A protein has these predicted regions:
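Conserved donor sugar-nucleotide recognition element shared by glycan-biosynthetic enzymes
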Residues: 23-26, 53, 137-140
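Serine-esterase "nucleophile elbow" of acetyl-processing enzymes
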Residues: 1-49, 59-68, 184
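Short, flexible loop segments at the rims of nucleotide/cofactor-binding pockets, characterized by
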Residues: 48-53, 132-133
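Short active-site-adjacent helix-start/loop capping segments
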Residues: 17, 52-55, 80-83
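Alpha-helical cap/lid subdomain in secreted, periplasmic
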Residues: 58-195
Length: 195
């Protein structure tokens, strides 16, 4: 009998699968793909719609010590951006998150991901000027990539795929979050890159 890989998916609405169901979130679909390939995966997805880095630090990171994950995915930042976080504050929060992951799960493989370009969503205009929002998303993603690299985490750049999905209008009725098909495409790409 194989020892299960312990997969902890940290994040916000894009991780829990808002716009579909948690069972169709990208971590759940990714775990299913790996199971189909014979891997034994125990997934924990504590992500919550609306979470920012403060919430992740307070509510999700304590699970590291209990779960002792062998794999961690990290996708966080959209709500920091919406709440007006500065780039410096976002960076310092990511440093704290990566340090805590390394301290509490030193042997885990960490895969950091970008946030999608939600400025392309039908509801994107509700958050301000679309060009300004798109530029901030790109800067936040650059910071996330830099801090992932600095921490020794893997950066999987799904942003080109995510942006193409946005341009094609791959949104559920909420007009903001990715569709079930979009999340599944993220999972398939991750399965190709991060096996």
């Amino acid at each position: 009998m194989s020892i299960p890989e312990r997969f902890l998916a940290l994040g916000d609405s894009f991780t829990i699968g808002t716009g579909t169901t948690p069972e169709r979130s990208f971590p759940a679909v990714l775990a299913d793909i790996w199971r189909e390939r014979g891997r034994v995966i125990a997934l924990t997805n504590p992500a919550v719609n609306g979470y920012a880095t403060d919430d992740l630090i307070q509510e999700e990171l304590p699970l590291l010590a209990a779960i002792r994950p062998t794999l961690v995915t990290l996708l966080i930042g959209a709500n920091d951006l919406v709440r007006g976080s500065t780039e410096d504050r976002y960076r310092s929060q990511l440093v704290r998150i990566h340090e805590r992951i390394r301290a509490d799960a030193p042997d885990a493989r960490v895969i950091a991901l970008p946030q999608p370009d939600w400025s392309l969503a039908p509801a994107g205009a509700a958050f301000g000027d679309l060009d300004t929002t798109a530029g901030r998303i790109e800067r936040f993603n650059a910071i996330a990539r830099e801090e992932a690299n600095r921490a020794g985490a893997d950066w999987v750049d799904l942003f080109p795929l995510m942006r193409e999905q946005g341009r094609l209008g791959s949104f559920p009725p909420d007009g903001l979050h990715p569709s079930e098909e979009a999340y599944a495409a993220w999972a398939r790409r991750l399965a190709e890159i991060a096996s």
